[in-house]
């Protein structure tokens, strides 16, 4: 059911870093596999042929020692006669003969029989196989099993350290992890206690450094033996940090005074926040300091985006303009004019921007040149949400419809009709031509617009009792958060609700899916909760405001694989406007 190719770890088991076995081979030796030559090399010129690996295993040695006591003597005619008779027996008769022999033997003979028989059930199959086949087998194991494999023998340990084995796990679980950051400067300094805000405990960095040094002296540098293994084990440590461990650090970013943070994005080391105070702020995540304040709008900023290349920041405002800023220094490059009402939403692919407005239109722009490309007209009311993949534009409006557009011709390809109230949220997955739309009519509709016109609806998901504020889709699993205070987990092909996650006391404002079954949600109740959507259970509260329930709320969430940004404030001045950063990162083992 679950759209996952990753490896599930038993939460109750020992962690992989704790299970790292004491190496049975030279610590300085690095083993690589050349599959064409079927041999190992240790980086120093020496090589280990695969045939040699498989010919001297401990189990093979045991088999040799367990041979018959008479194997070096001349053949015994009486024994040879019995063996010949035995071969002529049927299988059933042979089994009966075995049983009678055991019954007629004394305990000493039975012990010798056992020593001869047992090795046949303990064959070292990895040593008997070509190296590339052994690697293929190990690529199907999880990290805990690979740790156990490494403790069996030198041969098995060498195979378990091969880069390809851990690269396979890394691809299934933790891809594209950025290198660890040393977040100890600026706003990250001495922020373990945040007045009025409850967050997870922080690690004792001194204890961490001592623990790492002890492991390094005992086991040697894992990264040097297998970079992919080190990266994967770091990924598992990060996941455990999210689940239950103390966090690496926290930072408070104060800005926008008592105004609402309306939008927030992360790109590498940049965090961008937009506010109804007419400004945007560009923050450095590494030190938690403001790099630039973007002034220029004459109305509140309601939507913003960072370009995929990271060079541009784009913002839309109630002043009816779109502005393009240079991220490096905050310089205003272009002011895009044309909309006649609030710019409410935007989506970007490369340097092509699509904006949606309360003037019922969408506009396509080139942000490098600042030129207007075309206008998409067809909605009969305000455009509330938009998605864009570079070719296809999907928009949702207050006219209860979802429209599919060709971005370059400007033609409306399809109008999806079915909602009975305003469309507030959209998801678009271009590979499958799937659109998910959430409406004030409380329903979520899943469409496949590659189907014939009129047959696009593939699922009608009912159960929420208010508007859907956020959705994320992976495979057949859709997660939605709603103003009714509940999170629901759906199977879009079955059209069923798998889990209802209850715990928030007020409207849910934002949702972030980290993969591997972890979802974080924020709420007007002043909390951020982490859920396991596979089991349908609450893992823990990541943030809890003392002012929650009295006006303090979490407006927005934004995340990377190692960090969570929470936009915090209130509508009645009970909570200071700020962004809290929580660092769940881990160093290489």
Curated annotation (Swiss-Prot):
Keywords attached to this entry: Cell projection, Cytoplasm, Repeat, Ubl conjugation pathway, WD repeat
WD repeats: 255-295, 297-335, 338-375, 378-415, 418-457, 463-502, 503-541
F-box domain: residues covered: 123-169
One Gene Ontology CC term in the entry: cytoplasm
Composition bias, Acidic residues: 17-35
Annotated region described as Disordered, given as residue ranges: 1-56
PROSITE patterns: FBOX, WD_REPEATS_1, WD_REPEATS_2, WD_REPEATS_REGION
Compositionally biased intervals (Low complexity): 38-49
PANTHER family in the record: PHOSPHOLIPASE A-2-ACTIVATING PROTEIN
Protein name per UniProt: F-box/WD repeat-containing protein sel-10
Gene of this entry: sel-10
């Amino acid at each position: 059911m679950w759209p996952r190719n990753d490896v599930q770890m038993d939460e109750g088991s020992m962690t992989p870093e704790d299970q790292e076995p004491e190496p049975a081979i030279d610590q300085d030796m690095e083993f690589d596999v050349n599959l064409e030559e079927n041999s190992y090399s240790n980086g120093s010129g020496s090589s280990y042929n695969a045939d040699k690996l498989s010919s001297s295993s401990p189990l093979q040695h045991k088999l040799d020692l367990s041979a018959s006591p008479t194997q070096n003597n001349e053949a015994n005619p009486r024994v040879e006669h019995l063996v010949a008779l035995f071969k002529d027996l049927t299988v059933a008769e042979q089994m009966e003969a075995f049983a009678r022999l055991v019954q007629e033997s004394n305990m000493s003979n039975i012990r010798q029989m056992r020593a001869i028989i047992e090795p046949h059930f303990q064959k070292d199959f990895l040593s008997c196989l070509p190296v590339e086949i052994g690697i293929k087998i190990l690529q199907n194991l999880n990290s805990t099993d690979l740790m156990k494999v490494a403790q069996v023998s030198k041969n098995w340990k060498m195979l378990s350290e091969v880069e390809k084995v851990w690269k396979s796990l890394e691809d299934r679980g933790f891809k594209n992890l950025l290198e660890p950051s040393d977040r100890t400067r600026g706003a990250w300094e001495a922020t373990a206690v945040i007045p009025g805000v409850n967050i997870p405990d922080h690690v004792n960095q001194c204890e961490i450094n001592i623990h790492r040094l002890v492991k390094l002296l005992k086991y040697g540098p894992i990264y040097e033996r297998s970079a992919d293994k080190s990266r994967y084990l770091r990924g598992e440590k990060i996941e455990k940090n999210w689940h239950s461990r103390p966090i690496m650090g926290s930072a408070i970013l104060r800005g926008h005074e008592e105004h609402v943070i309306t939008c927030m994005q992360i790109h590498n080391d940049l965090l961008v926040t937009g506010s109804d105070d007419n400004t945007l702020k560009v923050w450095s995540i590494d030190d938690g300091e403001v790099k630039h304040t973007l002034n220029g709008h004459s109305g509140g900023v309601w939507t913003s985006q960072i370009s995929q290349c990271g060079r541009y920041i784009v913002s839309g405002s109630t002043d009816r303009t779109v502005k393009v800023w240079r991220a490096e220094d905050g310089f205003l490059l272009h002011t895009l004019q044309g909309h006649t009402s609030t710019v409410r939403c935007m989506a970007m692919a490369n340097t092509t921007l699509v904006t949606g407005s309360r003037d019922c239109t969408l506009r396509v722009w080139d942000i490098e040149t600042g030129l207007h490309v075309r206008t998409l007209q067809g909605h009969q009311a305000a455009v509330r949400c938009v998605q864009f993949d570079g070719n296809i534009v999907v928009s949702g409006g207050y006219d209860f419809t979802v429209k599919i557009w060709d971005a370059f011709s400007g033609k409306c390809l399809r109008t999806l009709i079915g909602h009975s109230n305003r469309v507030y949220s959209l998801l678009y997955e271009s590979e499958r031509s799937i659109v998910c739309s959430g409406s004030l009519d409380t329903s979520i509709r899943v469409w496949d617009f590659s189907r014939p016109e009129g047959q696009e609806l593939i699922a009608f998901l009912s159960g929420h009792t208010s508007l859907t504020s956020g959705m994320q889709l992976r495979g057949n699993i859709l997660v939605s958060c709603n103003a009714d205070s509940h999170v629901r987990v759906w199977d879009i092909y079955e059209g069923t609700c798998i889990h209802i996650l209850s715990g928030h006391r007020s409207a849910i404002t934002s949702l972030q899916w980290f993969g591997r079954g972890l979802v974080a949600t924020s709420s007007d109740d002043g909390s951020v909760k982490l859920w396991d959507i596979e089991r349908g259970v609450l893992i823990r509260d990541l943030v809890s405001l003392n002012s929650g329930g009295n006006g303090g709320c979490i407006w927005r969430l934004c995340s990377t694989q190692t960090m969570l940004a929470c936009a915090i404030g209130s509508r009645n001045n009970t909570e200071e406007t700020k962004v809290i950063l929580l660092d769940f990162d881990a160093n290489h083992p």
